[in-house]
Amino acid sequence: MALVQAHRARRLHAEAPDSGDQPPRRRVRQQPPRAAPAPARARRRRAPAPSPGGSRAPPTSGGPPASPLLDASSKDTPAAHRPPRGTVVAPRGCGLLQVIDAATNQPLEIRYHLDLARALTRLCEVNLQELPPDLSPRELQTMDSSHLRDVVIKLRPPRADIWTLGSRGVVVRSTITPLEQPDGQGQAAEVEDHQPNPPGEGLKFPLCFLVRGRQVNLVQDVQPVHRCQYCARFYKSQHECSARRRDFYFHHINSHSSNWWREIQFFPIGSHPRTERLFVTYDVETYTWMGAFGKQLVPFMLVMKFGGDEPLVTAARDLAVDLGWDRWEQDPLTFYCITPEKMAIGRQFRTFRDHLQMLMARDLWSSFVASNPHLADWALSEHGLSSPEELTYEELKKLPSIKGTPRFLELYIVGHNINGFDEIVLAAQVINNRSEVPGPFRITRNFMPRAGKILFNDVTFALPNPRSKKRTDFLLWEQGGCDDTDFKYQYLKVMVRDTFALTHTSLRKAAQAYALPVEKGCCAYQAVNQFYMLGSYRSEADGFPIQEYWKDREEFVLNRELWKKKGQDKYDIIKETLDYCALDVQVTAELVNKLRDSYASFVRDAVGLTDASFNVFQRPTISSNSHAIFRQIVFRAEQPARSNLGPDLLAPSHELYDYVRASIRGGRCYPTYLGILREPLYVYDICGMYASALTHPMPWGPPLNPYERALAARAWQQALDLQGCKIDYFDARLLPGVFTVDADPPDETQLDPLPPFCSRKGGRLCWTNERLRGEVATSVDLVTLHNRGWRVHLVPDERTTVFPEWRCVAREYVQLNIAAKERADRDKNQTLRSIAKLLSNALYGSFATKLDNKKIVFSDQMDAATLKGITAGQVNIKSSSFLETDNLSAEVMPAFEREYSPQQLALADSDAEESEDERAPTPFYSPPSGTPGHVAYTYKPITFLDAEEGDMCLHTLERVDPLVDNDRYPSHLASFVLAWTRAFVSEWSEFLYEEDRGTPLEDRPLKSVYGDTDSLFVTERGHRLMETRGKKRIKKHGGNLVFDPERPELTWLVECETVCGACGADAYSPESVFLAPKLYALKSLHCPSCGASSKGKLRAKGHAAEGLDYDTMVKCYLADAQGEDRQRFSTSRTSLKRTLASAQPGAHPFTVTQTTLTRTLRPWKDMTLARLDEHRLLPYSESRPNPRNEEICWIEMP
C-alpha cells in the first residue's frame, strides 16, 4: 500500500497493483499528475467555488471531471465499484529494538525485518542462492520460535546467531552451528533427512535471528550504542537528558530504585456518619493459682456495662438476661459473673461475645436479604441452593443488581489496661475463630500481639456494598468525611480497645484528667486473693481485713471509715469487691463517652474538620490517631486529588527503609559525674522538645535522581570544606538529605562533654568524640558537626537521598495543639488540655514506628496468598504455639485399671488367624482381685477434644526477604526531628562550654553532671551561664516555641524544673547522688529567694521506687566505693509475665504469670564513657577510645 494523490482535486486513492518487481525498500511514490492540482490538505476539504450561474466549474483541462463530494449517483454505485477513500499507509519493512546484552551488559540497537519469509527470500536472492525446496515461504510465515532450530538445520548456514528477548529489555545471545554436533559427528546425515540437496548446497552466509516470545524475525544488523545512566535513553553520539525523564526513570523504571520510595496511602479520618456502635465495657478481678507454669492469674469476677446506640444496647441487655448473667443492683445496664472455677469466667464471656456478634451479624444479613428479594431465587437457579445462607462470599458478590442502603456496625470490647492483662487472661477462652454466622460473610481477622500486649484483635464480617465505586471528587475527603461509595463492603466489625492506650495513665489519674467523678477508697485485693487461695483471710471481728492487706495505715483507716458509713454489721469481701469492680467499670464507661465526645469536638473545632464523624476508638492507640490527624491536615493542605498523600511526602521502603532507620538515633542519657555531689544543682528541661522540633523545616518532595543528587552533594561538600566558616541551618542553597559521612573531631581541647553526634559502632549507643566512619546522618547533623569544628566528608553511596526543598510540614499540626492547649488553660478545660498534650507528643513516635516482616496468625486464618508464599519459600514459619485446651468442649474418659492373664498377654503378640478361637477368654475382663499370675495396667484419663488443630495453633510467620515494605510512615521525618533536637542541645552546649575551648578537659570547671534526652543538670556556674548567655532560651524571659518561616532560626525554650513550691523561684538541690543512667537522687530542694525547702527528686528506673530513698542510694555508693562486697543492696517488685505467642518451652501462650523480680542496686559498671578521675566521666575520644569498637580493615601485605 502507498499514499498516492488522486488525479482530481483533493482526493486520495490506493495505488493500482503493480505486477512488476520492485526494490525491497520501496518508497512511497507519487504518480505524475496530468495537470498540476492544488495542494492537498489532510484535515479539511472544500468544495470548488460555484460558478456564477449556480453550476459547478468545468473540470481542469487535461484531467477527468471532478465529482462532487456527495451526489446522488455515488449513493447508487455498488460498494465494490466505488473508488477507495481515506488515507492509505504503507507498512513498515523493519523494526527497531533497543536492548541490553545479558553477557556483556552492553546496550545494543537491533534492526530486524518484520516479514521473515520475504526478508529471508530476498537475502538469498542477493547472495545468488535459493531456499531449500522443503522450506516454503508459507512455512516461514507461520513459524514460531519452537521450530527455529529445525529451520536453521534445513538452511545449513555457517553460523546462526539467535538473540532471545527476555524481561525488561535484556537479550541473551546463543549460536547454532549446524555443521558441528556436540558429540563430534557431522551433520551431513541428519541434513539429508531434512533436505534433498547435497550437503555442500547449504547457505554460504551466516544468519541472525531475533526471538520475541514465540515470534521470530530476521535481524538486519546489530550495532552497539550508548545508554544514559540517568534516564536510560539509548543514543549513538549524544542526546538531550531532561530532568523529568531522569526523575521518572529513577522512581518508576529503574529496577533497583523504583521501590525505594512508596506513596503513603490515605483514607479520611472520619468514619461513616451512619455507623451503629455498641460498647461493652468490662473489667475482671483475678486470684493467684499455682499451676504448671507458675503463679498463674485466674479470673473469678467479670463486670460489664453496655453503651452506644439504643437499639444495640437493648439487644445486648436482653441477650445478657437470656444467658443468665446477674444484674448489678445499682445500674440496669451493668451485669456480672462471679465464680472461682478455673476457665469458667472466660467461657461465659466468650459465649456472650459469640452470641452478641452472631446476633449483630444476622441483623446485618437480614437487612441485606430484605433489600434483595431476588436473592433466594437466584441462589436456587444459579447454584442449586435452597437457602442463600449456603452461598459463599465469592458467589454472593456475583449477584446481579445488588440493592439496598449499606449498613456499618461496630462492636467495641473496651476496658482499661486490658490489652496487657485482662485480654491475655481471657484470650484462650474468648478467641473463637468459628462462629455460627451466615456463610456469605467475608470474615477477616487482624490479630497483632506486640511487646507483650494485644495491639489488635479485630474481626470483620463483610458483605458487598452496592454503592461502592472509585472516588473522583476528593472535596469531601479533604474535609475528613466519607460516604457510602468509599467503602468496598458493608460490615460488622468486632474490635478490642484499651483506654490505657489512649490515655497513657492509670484509670484514677485518667478520670481526674478528664474531669470524671472518682469514688474514694479501694479494695484489699491481697485479702481477696488469699481468700480464694486458702479459703480465708485475716480479719477483725467484723470481717474487715487487717492493716497488713492495705498499702499503709492511712489507706486502712480511710477504707474502714467508708465501710462503716454503710451501716453494715459484717464485712462481705466478695460483695465489696464486686462494688469496687463495678464502680471501676462505671468510670471506664464514662471515660469512653468522654473520650469519644472530646476527641470528636477537638477534630471538629480545633482542627476545623466539620464534616468528619471522628471516632477515636476506630484506631487503637493515641499514636495512630495523631498520625491520622497529621495525614488529614496534609491532605487538606496539598489537595492531591488521589487516594494517597501525593508524590511530595513519601515513605522509605526496601533498602531505603533500613538506610533511613540507621539515621534515627535515640536521645542521650548518661551522667558525667558519679558519686555524691555537694554543691547546688539545678535541673533545666526543654519545653515540648519534640513539638518544637516538629515545627522546623522537614524534607519535602520526591528525592532527587542521581544526577541532581550528585550536584546537591557537591554543593554540600564545598560548604563543609570551608573550615572556620559556620553554615546556616536554613541556607536555601543547601538541600535537605540523608548522607553517609566520615567525620573527624577537632583537637581535644576544643571538645566538651556534650558531643554533637552518637554512634552504635561499638554495639551500644555512645555519645562520642571519636572519629566517625560510615555513619548515616541527616543534613541537619552535617551542619551541627561542621559548626562544632568537625571535618565532615560525604562518602559516595547510591542510597544517599537528597530532597528538592524544605517544608514545615508538621507546623500546622503542632500549632493546632498549642492553640488548643492555651485555650484549655484559659477556660480551665482539663479534658482539652490532656488531649492537646497527648497528641502533641505522640506524632513523633508515629513517624519512628518500626516495622518488621513478622506476623502472627491462627492456623485456620492463613489465606491463599500466605499459603502460596509458604509453599514458594517466600515465607517461613518461625514458631508455632498451641493454646490451652480447657476452653474447648471435651469428653473425658476417667482413669481405669485392667488386669490381664499371661494367656491374654500372649494374644497381644499373636497373629490374627491364631486368635479366632471363640472359646478363648475375652481379652478384656475383670478377674477376681488378687488372682495370681495376672498383670495390672493403669490407664490415665483420656481427653477427646471437640476441636480442630487450626483452632488451637498459632503461627509466627516471617518473610524470607529481609527488606521491609513500607507505605505508611515517613520515617525520614523522625530522623530530622531527632536531628533538630540534637541541634538544640548543641546550641545549649555552646552556652555552657564555648568559653572553655582551648582548655584541657581535666582542667575545666564542673558545669553539668547529668544529661537526659531533653534535660540537663547544671551546677551553680552552669546556672549563671544559662541566665546570661542562654537567657533568650529561658521560657520565663519570653520566646517562641513554634518555628517562624519568615524569620528562620532555631526555636526552642527551656525552663527550670527545680522550682520553689512557695514562691515559684528557681530552686536547687544542695546535695545529690548519681549512680547510673536513670538512677539518681536529689536530697532536697532549697529556694535561695524565700529560703523554703521541699522534697527532692528520686529516679530509679527498673527498681521499686517506694523501697528507695536518698540515704539508701548514698549508702550503696559508699559501700561500692569502699569495696564492701558483703553488703548488697537490692529492690524487689511484683512483675507480670505476659506470654502471647512464644517458642520457648516454659512459656505457655495466652497466660499471665506473677513473678517477683529482685534487682541489685549498684553504681554504673558497664559504662559508655571514659573515666577522668574518681567522679568525673568524659565521652570517648581519640586519646580515650571506646574499648568495644572492633573495626575490621583490609590490609594487603607486600
From Swiss-Prot:
The organism's place on the tree of life at top rank: Viruses
Keyword Glycosyltransferase set for record: no
Subcellular locations according to the entry: Host nucleus
GO biological process: DNA-templated DNA replication; viral DNA strand displacement replication
Pfam assignment, any one: DNA_pol_B_2
Keywords, comma-separated and alphabetical: DNA replication, DNA-binding, DNA-directed DNA polymerase, Host nucleus, Nucleotidyltransferase, Transferase, Viral DNA replication
Cross-referenced SUPFAM superfamilies: DNA/RNA polymerases, Ribonuclease H-like
Keyword set includes Secreted: no
Enzyme nomenclature, EC number: 2.7.7.7
Additional comment: This DNA polymerase requires a protein as a primer.
Role noted for this protein: Eukaryotic-type DNA polymerase involved in viral genomic replication. DNA synthesis is protein primed, and acts in a strand displacement replication. Assembles in complex with viral pTP, DBP, host NFIA and host POU2F1/OCT1 on viral origin of replication. The polymerase covalently transfers dCMP onto pTP, thereby initiating complementary strand synthesis.
Protein name per the record: DNA polymerase
Originating species: Human adenovirus C serotype 2 (HAdV-2)
Gene: POL
